[in-house]
């Protein structure tokens, strides 16, 4: 016999269903190729060239990509959940490629803490983060760094995923503390500090 409050049944889309429908709607949006950007398709291999560089990506076999009059359309064969998800994802990735080769992506990090700082060392970063030795962070292929001041790092590149992952990897070298806020954080990140324990 069931004891306690009975679970409430609700009508409507399941969480997964809502996500699939969202990705499907994204996939249906055509992509306009801006002037100065060239897109070519060889089988399922998509190449995007622009002022900032070139990116290539293999398109999933279930997804079709066509181009006419500087407009790219992404289509799926049916409404299966996998294909609806791939539909939106593929459209997003292609759009990111076009934006990257045209304008480049950036992610800014800030360093907080007495004595904490960063300096360029060739193409790499030399980080002083309170350890007994400096931390050298090597730039992955396709990534460059700007250091406008000793407490700011700007990660730059045409691959949005790589820019984001590189910034995340730098942050792990000294994540911000919750008590003093010392460490490396994203420029837009808000650190919710905890109050330290006080003696009685």
Model-derived features with residue positions:
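Short, Lys/Arg-enriched N-terminal segments with co-localized hydrophobic residues
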Residues: 3-22
